[in-house]
Amino acid sequence: MNNEITFPYPYIVERLDHYYGLKSHFPKKVISTEQPKKRNPFTKGSKKKLSILIATFWSYPHVGGLSNYITTLSKGLKSQGHKVDIISPNQFSTSKVKKFRESVTPNLKNFFTKRYGSYSDRILNHKRLIYVYEKMLETIDLEKYDILHAQDLFTANILGRFNETYRKPLFYTPHGMFTFNRLKFNIIKKDSVEESYFKELESKAIEYASHIIVLSDSFREPLIKLGAKNRNITTVITGIDYPMSPRQEKETPSHKLTITCVARLGPRKGHNHLFEALSYIKKYTTNIEVLIVGDGQMRETLERQKKALGLSMVKFLGSRDDVPLILSKTDIFVLPTINDSLPLSIIEAMHSGTAVISTNCGGIPELIKNNKTGIVLEPGNSEQLAHALKFLIKNKEARNTMSTNAKNFAKKHLTIDSMVGKIKHLYTDFWEMN
């Protein structure tokens, strides 16, 4: 009976069986983890033009770092003559999606109820999404690709299963640590069946991957805890193709100093801590404007907080498509995030030549060298943030020095050429071995 199970995936069923105290055994498939011979991964290799599939479980295009990463990588690879296809669930027919969803839901409910006596709504809904996405990916001829690049753990699981037949180099880039972040914010509970389920998917994504490309070194430790080998992980910091707008000089005293925050208005971005910090230093903000760029679920709450704290200098601009222009007029960029990987907005601010204040979440300390290219704080510490703001408001020389250093760092390390070149050489190494 066990051997007949193909969906849910046998390894998921085995993990859930273990959680519920059932005995089961599924034959283990040996997945090759052979790596290219040791050499500098960023030296020039083959000039072959590759055919590459970049795939994500999430909607694309969309606002945010993941969508930008995919667009940037695809654009850079195409500029070098490579063929790139991008696949995401929202590209498929809504009628077909509905049909698949309706067909699998009762089967999943029946399977989980018969086997475990009940089912988790979260797991049921997720398995339904996985099933639909897998059915869509089944229609694609993977044989025509030289390289497969999954942008999340779910796509890595699906492509990994298919790749048992095709044996293509499969790269995996996590854009966040899925289970860890959901535990941190109480979206799922510690020691729950949901934790067991998602951790198994994360571990299997690592097992299926020929190589893991991470956005920052902050991913290494949690990935290694899930079973990754350090030698199978390469850090490639995100680069962007940033429009070079000349900075707006503010020579006269009548010009206000501009502080800008570009971020989705959500609970993880820490706008409330920025507002608290501003309330501590009101006497230093008489000739200052604070621009809040972005929109989201927290807007009404933040507008009430602004009013309650008497922060007349704060202006909500909503979503904007002229962020580079806004940043070119910005003196201090602030991102008080309490949970992040490698924020695109910081990279944009550094390219614009703006002094940056942010927190030590994720890979941010790999972008901001404290007191050199900006200031790094503890997340959620409004007093530290107030002190940093006051320092840069009062100290023009420090602002200018950090701005210059940030721009120089971005021009050297955070470009599309740097990012794409490193990833392309990894692709080439694995393609040549394959």
Question: At which residue positions do the language-model features occur?
Answer:
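Conserved acidic donor-binding segment of nucleotide-sugar-dependent glycosyltransferases
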Residues: N370-N371, I375-S382, F391-E397
